[in-house]
Design a protein with these regions (language model features):
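Amphipathic alpha-helical effector-binding/dimerization core
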Residues: 1-63
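Structural motif
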Residues: 4, 15, 104, 116-118
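A short, polar/proline- and glycine-enriched secondary-structure boundary/capping micro-motif
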Residues: 27-30, 71, 129-131
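Juxtadomain coupling helices with adjacent low-complexity linkers
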Residues: 76, 89, 100-101, 116-153
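Sensor-regulatory modules in signal-transduction proteins
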Residues: 109-112
Length: 153
């Protein structure tokens, strides 16, 4: 598929790309290393948020509520929906919520030292529907994350 695949880590209320692979024809999806993504609306951020401890999640939730103010209820709804998906399926989605033209899936990767990162795949919404992402690609991404964790990194 014509999707970008990326690895992100947390920086306050953002996720930062530390590695990324783009398809050669990617014009809409320029996710360069070092790019900061908002935690609340991206699949990377949501995957991280869902995978951390309740205590850690409370700290982040309080900080996001203060940051977003009146926009917080909409962001909170997206995070709650992602938590439901994560508990059921092991992945999180962002279907046009960060960028209306981008659909993405994210899964956490738990490293042996306790660090949590997020693995993502994303594509323009005209190439990958939310349904295809949910029914096929996100499950494959979750299996890839599990394979990476089993390597003991």
């Amino acid at each position: 598929t014509n999707m970008s695949v990326g690895l992100t880590c947390r920086d306050r209320l953002h996720m930062i790309y530390v590695e990324n692979r783009l398809p050669p024809e990617a014009s809409l999806l320029r996710m360069d290393i070092g790019l900061k993504l908002p935690m609340a609306t991206t699949s990377a951020g949501r995957a991280y948020y869902c995978a951390i401890s309740d205590k850690g999640r409370k700290v982040i939730t309080d900080a996001m509520e203060a940051k977003y103010g009146d926009a917080w209820p909409e962001k909170q709804e997206g995070l709650e929906r992602s938590m439901e998906d994560y508990k059921k399926y092991g992945f999180c989605l962002s279907l046009g919520e960060w960028d209306r033209n981008i659909n993405s899936a994210g899964v956490p990767i738990h490293l042996q030292d306790g660090t949590i990162m997020a693995l993502t795949c994303a594509a323009p919404s005209y190439l990958i529907s939310g349904e295809k992402l949910r029914e096929s690609i996100a499950h494959q991404l979750a299996m890839l994350a599990s394979d990476i964790e089993s390597l003991g990194v």
